[in-house]
């Protein structure tokens, strides 16, 4: 599930990766973005992409329906992060994961304002406080951290 899918930049790449037997949920709170994703679904005949117009505090996905949540540069927009994590935990299938990619908390000429950035260490602490442990970390991105969490 691509949380904060926007225009579907990652959604359609993930859909290609999971193939015809997989499914990618494009989750966004913006009706305009969902319309854009729906248009791309039709244009590309992406039968494995399902768009979801979500609530700000609920991705509106069925329990145990998601293998992996993909959250790139949008976590700071989620107002009630504790509630959101609780819901995602229920929505994960056994063995599921949450991928968090976000900007390092330092001054950059792009990305969200400094006060909205979440430090890597704070993200790990927040996830641990909500029942998720760090299972993998990738360091190939120069300006962002790439963390993978699994329920404890």
Go through each PLM region and give its residues.
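Class I SAM-dependent methyltransferase SAM/SAH-binding core
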Residues: 1-59
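A short SAM/SAH-binding and catalytic strip from SAM-dependent methyltransferases
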Residues: 67-81
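Short strand-turn motif at the edge of the Rossmann-like AdoMet-binding core
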Residues: 29, 74, 101-104
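A short glycine-rich, Lys/Arg-flanked "PGG" loop and its adjoining helix->strand segment in the class I
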Residues: 15-19, 82-97
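Glycine-rich phosphate-binding loops of nucleotide-dependent enzymes
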Residues: 4, 66, 77, 95, ...
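Conserved class I S-adenosyl-L-methionine
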Residues: 97-124
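A short acidic, Gly/Pro-enriched loop at the edge of an enzyme's catalytic core
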Residues: 57-69
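Core SAM-dependent methyltransferase catalytic element
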Residues: 130, 135-152
């Amino acid at each position: 599930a691509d949380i904060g899918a926007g225009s579907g930049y990652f959604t359609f790449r993930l859909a290609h990766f999971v193939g015809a037997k997989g499914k990618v949920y494009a989750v966004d709170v913006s009706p305009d973005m969902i319309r854009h994703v729906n248009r791309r679904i039709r244009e590309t005949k992406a039968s494995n992409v399902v768009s979801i117009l979500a609530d700000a505090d609920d991705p509106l996905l069925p329990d145990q329906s998601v293998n992996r949540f993909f959250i790139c540069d949008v976590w700071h927009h989620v107002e009630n992060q504790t509630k959101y994590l609780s819901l995602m935990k229920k929505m994960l299938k056994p063995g599921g994961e949450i991928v968090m990619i976000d900007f390092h908390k330092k001054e950059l000429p792009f990305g969200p304002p400094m006060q909205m950035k979440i430090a890597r260490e704070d993200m790990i602490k927040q996830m641990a406080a909500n029942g998720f442990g760090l299972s993998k970390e990738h360091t190939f991105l120069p300006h962002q951290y790439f963390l993978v969490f699994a329920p404890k």
